[in-house]
Amino acid sequence: MPRKSKTDAGEGVSPVDQIQAYLEQNKGDHYNFEEERSYVVSSGSLLMDIEMGGGIGPGVIRASGLTEGGKTSCALAFAKNFQKMDNAMVVYFKAEGRLTKEMVKRAGIDQDPLKWREIKSNVYETVINLMRQLVQNNDRNFKYMFIIDSMDSLVPKADLEKGPEEANKVAGGALLSSDFLRKMALGLSTRGHICYMISQVRSNVSINPYQKTDAKV
């Protein structure tokens, strides 16, 4: 008759207990003890909502397309419907100058300070640090929709004082997007927040700082 292991005999620590103990000791490194918050925000278009399963929910949404292709207007349409929920605030990071007061008014955005805030900064660290602070220190249980317009215009603080050639990066916007997702995506989706990242799909990516990259869908 084969000899029973300690686990089979009911002795020792089970894997379930080990995992639970580890999670208890490292609460700051995971979201297992937090209840996921789920909802759907309509685009305002029936056809688009059907294609998207009703709209968008918590997590990171990436909207890419041509310059002047309506990406900002689409984001504002989602923002208007997001504001209809209780304790729902839109934080718009204006990293380039496309958004105007007329666009905000035309989209029907509620500009109450607890519903809408525009942050004019293209510094990557400023954007991600403010988002982290709002998500991690949320005693009033707000739901946030962060709109970054656009990822291509964000610049790391260390690059601001460099010359144009020294600071040049191949596909810099994509690199920042990847770093952002690693740091923020899981926390946003678990805690019920949306980050709407606007960017352009580029062709002719080159290490030559004098060669123009073309927007392309």
Model segments located where?
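Conserved RecA-like ASCE ATPase "motif II neighborhood" in helicase/translocase motors
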Residues: 128-140, 163, 211-215
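Loop/turn-to-beta-strand initiation segments
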Residues: 88-89, 141-145, 190-197
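Conserved nucleotide-binding/hydrolysis micro-motifs of P-loop NTPases
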Residues: 96-100, 122-125, 151-155, 178, ...
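Intrinsically disordered, low-complexity linker/loop segments enriched in Gly/Pro
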Residues: 93, 114, 143, 151-152, ...
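Phosphate-binding/switch region of NTP-binding enzymes
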Residues: 170-217
